[in-house]
UniProtKB/Swiss-Prot annotation:
The lineage of its organism: Archaea, Methanobacteriati, Methanobacteriota, Stenosarchaea group, Methanomicrobia. The keyword rRNA-binding applies. Belongs to the universal ribosomal protein uL14 family. This is Large ribosomal subunit protein uL14. SMART domains: Ribosomal_L14 (SM01374).
């Protein structure tokens, strides 16, 4: 896993509901905790593009519902600024379910994937149809 190329805003807090953009069976997920977050003074854990979180499946197939899974954020509504000055934002907040080795559990990704995520996770980049 490589480092992020640009500083992405952490716009997604715990409790946020996101769409799942792969074919694992999960449709709507909710953030439970963020990996690598060490807060102070009762601050809410937040995350952005390329961050990994533990999420619970709220809507989906019966075998996926009510399960805790790991997920990577591939799209977020909050715009981010790239080093060349370009500002990028997406229509929705979306994640992809991954395993302990940060490899995707599904076989396809619906919709675009941010370039920063594709560079950081090569398997996600190879599965994506559109990289923005």
């Amino acid at each position: 896993m490589k480092a992020k190329q640009s500083k992405t805003p952490r716009a997604l807090a715990t409790g946020t509901k996101l769409t799942c953009a792969d074919n694992t069976g999960a449709r709507i997920v909710q953030i439970v905790s963020v990996f690598g977050y060490h807060g102070v003074r009762r601050r809410q854990p937040k995350m952005g593009l390329g961050d990994i979180a533990t999420v619970t499946v709220k809507k989906g197939t019966p075998d996926m519902r009510k399960k805790l899974v790991r997920a990577v954020v591939i799209r977020q509504k909050k715009e981010m600024r790239r080093p060349n000055g370009l500002r990028v934002s997406f229509d929705d907040n979306a994640v992809v379910v991954v395993d302990e080795k940060n490899e995707p559990k599904g076989t396809e990704i619906k919709g675009p994937v941010a370039r920063e995520v594709a560079e950081r996770y090569p398997k996600l980049g190879s599965m994506a149809t559109i990289i923005v």
